[in-house]
């Protein structure tokens, strides 16, 4: 019974789970992540790639797969420390919304957007994807789906479908 009860990934529980994993000292993540704090798989084109190069390869690959066009609206679900959203904004003329449930990641992302002078192009919010009611031309989510929980897959994909414009593209990793 307890396992069944705790497997529900309701909004409040999701925020608690994220806080438990990500709202801790950033010094820990600095020990093993690349300088942009990407916390998902990397794309090593060859064995000589450093972790940082492989993470940048991943971003470039994602941007290519999204087939981004100028002035599109992009949603990054589970934006983490904001790297993907910031790089999309920096490399395209798209407006990007990154959402996270982590207070630390939100503050870090907003600070990076300010440092990179991208505040007018990228926005970060402390928000659950289930609470959004906007349309996006592109939706990307890297390394977040594993936190959704099997019982919420249908809700997740229905929400992505609802948020995606009719001719939009979603990339879920």
Can you name each region flagged by the protein language model?
Residues 71-78:
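Conserved class I S-adenosyl-L-methionine
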Residues 130-139:
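A short acidic, Gly/Pro-enriched loop at the edge of an enzyme's catalytic core
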Residues 109-110:
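Conserved SAM-binding loop
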Residues 154-167:
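A short glycine-rich, Lys/Arg-flanked "PGG" loop and its adjoining helix->strand segment in the class I
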Residues 1-31:
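N-terminal auxiliary segments of SAM/dcSAM-dependent transferases
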Residues 167-173:
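Conserved beta-strand signature within the Rossmann-like core of class I S-adenosyl-L-methionine
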Residues 140-145:
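A conserved beta-strand element that flanks and buttresses the S-adenosyl-L-methionine
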Residues 81-92:
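Conserved SAM-binding loop of SAM-dependent methyltransferases across substrates and taxa
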């Amino acid at each position: 019974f307890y396992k069944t009860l705790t497997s529900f990934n309701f909004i409040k529980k999701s925020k608690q789970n994220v806080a438990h994993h990500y709202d801790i000292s950033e010094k820990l993540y600095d020990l093993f992540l690349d300088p942009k704090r990407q916390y998902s798989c990397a794309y090593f084109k060859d064995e000589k790639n450093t972790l940082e190069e492989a993470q940048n390869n991943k971003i470039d690959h994602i941007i290519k797969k999204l087939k981004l066009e100028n002035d599109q609206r992009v949603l990054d679900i589970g934006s983490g420390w904001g790297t993907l959203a910031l790089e999309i904004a920096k490399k395209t003329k798209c407006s990007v919304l990154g959402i996270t449930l982590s207070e630390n990641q939100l503050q870090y992302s907003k600070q990076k957007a300010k440092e990179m002078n991208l505040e007018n192009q990228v926005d970060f919010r402390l928000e659950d994807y289930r609470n959004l009611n906007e349309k996006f031309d592109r939706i990307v989510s890297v390394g977040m789906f594993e936190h959704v929980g099997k019982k919420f897959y249908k809700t997740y994909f229905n929400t992505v479908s609802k948020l995606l414009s009719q001719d939009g593209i979603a990339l879920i990793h």
